[in-house]
Protein backbone atom coordinates (compact mmCIF):
# COMPACT_ATOMS: atom_id res chain seq x y z
CA UNK A 1 0.00 0.00 0.00
CA UNK A 2 1.34 3.45 -0.96
CA UNK A 3 2.08 6.04 1.70
CA UNK A 4 -0.03 9.17 1.69
CA UNK A 5 2.09 12.19 0.67
CA UNK A 6 2.33 15.16 3.00
CA UNK A 7 0.03 17.94 1.86
CA UNK A 8 1.37 21.25 0.64
CA UNK A 9 -1.28 23.16 2.57
CA UNK A 10 -0.39 23.64 6.25
CA UNK A 11 -2.02 25.44 9.17
CA UNK A 12 -0.08 28.41 10.56
CA UNK A 13 -0.59 30.75 13.52
CA UNK A 14 -0.33 34.51 13.06
CA UNK A 15 0.49 36.64 16.12
CA UNK A 16 0.34 40.42 16.50
CA UNK A 17 3.77 42.10 16.61
CA UNK A 18 2.63 45.48 17.97
CA UNK A 19 0.72 43.97 20.90
CA UNK A 20 3.89 42.73 22.66
CA UNK A 21 5.40 46.23 22.60
CA UNK A 22 2.23 47.89 23.96
CA UNK A 23 2.50 46.09 27.32
CA UNK A 24 -1.24 45.30 27.46
CA UNK A 25 -2.25 41.84 28.75
CA UNK A 26 -3.43 39.15 26.32
CA UNK A 27 -2.47 38.43 22.71
CA UNK A 28 -4.11 38.59 19.30
CA UNK A 29 -3.70 35.38 17.27
CA UNK A 30 -5.27 34.09 14.06
CA UNK A 31 -5.12 30.61 12.51
CA UNK A 32 -4.92 30.36 8.72
CA UNK A 33 -3.54 28.05 6.03
CA UNK A 34 -0.79 28.58 3.51
CA UNK A 35 0.58 26.64 0.56
CA UNK A 36 4.07 25.40 1.41
CA UNK A 37 5.22 25.33 -2.25
CA UNK A 38 4.12 28.86 -3.19
CA UNK A 39 4.92 30.61 0.11
CA UNK A 40 8.16 29.26 1.54
CA UNK A 41 8.93 32.28 3.75
CA UNK A 42 6.92 33.27 6.83
CA UNK A 43 3.56 34.98 6.34
CA UNK A 44 3.04 38.60 7.35
CA UNK A 45 -0.52 39.95 7.08
CA UNK A 46 -2.42 42.98 8.34
CA UNK A 47 -5.29 41.80 10.55
CA UNK A 48 -7.64 43.42 13.06
CA UNK A 49 -6.50 43.33 16.69
CA UNK A 50 -9.62 43.50 18.93
CA UNK A 51 -7.58 44.38 22.04
CA UNK A 52 -5.84 47.39 20.46
CA UNK A 53 -8.99 48.10 18.38
CA UNK A 54 -7.09 48.67 15.12
CA UNK A 55 -5.47 46.87 12.20
CA UNK A 56 -1.93 45.69 12.99
CA UNK A 57 0.77 43.51 11.41
CA UNK A 58 0.51 39.82 12.33
CA UNK A 59 3.48 37.52 11.66
CA UNK A 60 3.66 33.74 11.44
CA UNK A 61 5.06 32.06 14.56
CA UNK A 62 6.89 28.72 14.82
Curated annotation (Swiss-Prot):
One function term, GO molecular function aspect: structural constituent of ribosome
GO biological process, one term: translation
Taxonomy, superkingdom: Bacteria
Ribosomal protein as UniProt keyword: yes
Pfam families: Ribosomal_L33
Keywords: Ribonucleoprotein, Ribosomal protein
GO CC, alphabetical: cytoplasm; ribonucleoprotein complex; ribosome
InterPro entries, per the entry: Ribosomal_bL33 (IPR001705), Ribosomal_bL33_sf (IPR038584), Ribosomal_zn-bd (IPR011332)
NCBIfam families reported for this sequence: PRK00504.1, PRK00595.1, rpmG_bact
Family: Belongs to the bacterial ribosomal protein bL33 family.
Protein known as: Large ribosomal subunit protein bL33
Native source organism of the sequence: Bacteroides thetaiotaomicron (strain ATCC 29148 / DSM 2079 / JCM 5827 / CCUG 10774 / NCTC 10582 / VPI-5482 / E50)
Higher taxonomy: Bacteria, Pseudomonadati, Bacteroidota, Bacteroidia, Bacteroidales
Amino acid sequence: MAKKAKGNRVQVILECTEHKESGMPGTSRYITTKNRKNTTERLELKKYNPILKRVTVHKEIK
